[in-house]
């Protein structure tokens, strides 16, 4: 989960998600931070940085945070996992609509997302609504560079359509990439992401490509400091954030809780 320093408050910061009871977040060292779950939960999100910059920690934090505060009735996921490493553990969640880890299944999963988006637009048209009022669907992709290098012809048109139209239908892309190159994160694709989390990059040029300014190249190596740091670009604003790493035991506990539920809340 992402946190921003809240220096003017002596109380834990809270965030209301999906109109539910506010959730209080306190870091292990007792400092108070303002959570970014509300912002992340309602936008496309791009997470990118060099290898070892904390991308997997951030993605796991986002998924775990969303699952901790909402039921499968309100939040669903399509997991696109060409790396076959980080997202596999979430396949058994009742929130998981589809899990894909090979070319055929990845194309099928993205096609499913587009079909669901179109279905929601049909409902919105029939009800004369500008935004979808039902559940949120997150299409989590780890690793974007694998798709853009191996399956671009089949997958990029689907990704671009979701990026351009998905937000109104509550179909949100969460894309992670450890390759910060223009041929992977194209300007046509990136401009549809109002929220970008820039992690440590190799060069200032890569930082500018991600968040439109320098800074990511100066972030410390999380392996050396023991904690993840990043820079979030939210529209025209940028700010530094610390990234809390959920222990593997906590992620497992959350997954086991939901898989043990006899019925969906």
Annotate each predicted stretch with a short phrase:
Residues 2-125, 135-205, 211-227, 231-232, ...:
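P-loop NTPase catalytic phosphate-binding loop
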């Amino acid at each position: 989960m992402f946190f921003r320093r809240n220096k003017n408050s002596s109380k834990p910061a809270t965030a209301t998600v999906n109109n539910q009871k506010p959730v209080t977040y306190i870091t292990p060292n007792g400092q108070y931070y303002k959570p970014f779950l509300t912002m992340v939960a309602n936008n496309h999100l791009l997470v990118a940085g060099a290898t070892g910059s904390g991308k997997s920690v951030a993605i796991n934090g986002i998924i775990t945070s969303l699952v901790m505060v909402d039921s499968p009735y309100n939040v669903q996921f399509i997991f696109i996992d060409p790396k076959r490493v980080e997202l596999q553990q979430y396949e058994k969640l009742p929130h998981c609509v589809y899990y894909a880890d090979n070319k055929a299944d990845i194309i099928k999963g993205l096609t499913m997302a587009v079909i669901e988006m179109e279905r929601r637009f049909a409902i919105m048209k029939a009800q004369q609504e500008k935004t979808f009022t039902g559940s949120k669907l997150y299409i989590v992709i780890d690793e974007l560079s694998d798709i853009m290098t191996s399956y671009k012809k089949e997958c990029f048109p689907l990704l671009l359509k979701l990026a351009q139209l998905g937000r109104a239908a509550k179909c949100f892309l969460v894309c992670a990439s450890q390759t910060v190159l223009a041929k992977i994160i194209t300007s046509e694709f990136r401009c549809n992401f109002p929220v970008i989390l820039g992690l440590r990059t190799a060069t200032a040029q890569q930082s500018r490509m991600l968040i439109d300014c320098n800074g990511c190249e100066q972030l410390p190596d999380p392996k050396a400091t023991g904690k993840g740091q990043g820079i979030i670009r939210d529209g025209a604003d940028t700010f530094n954030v610390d990234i809390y790493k959920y222990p593997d035991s906590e992620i497992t506990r959350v997954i086991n809780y939901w898989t043990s539920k006899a019925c969906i809340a």
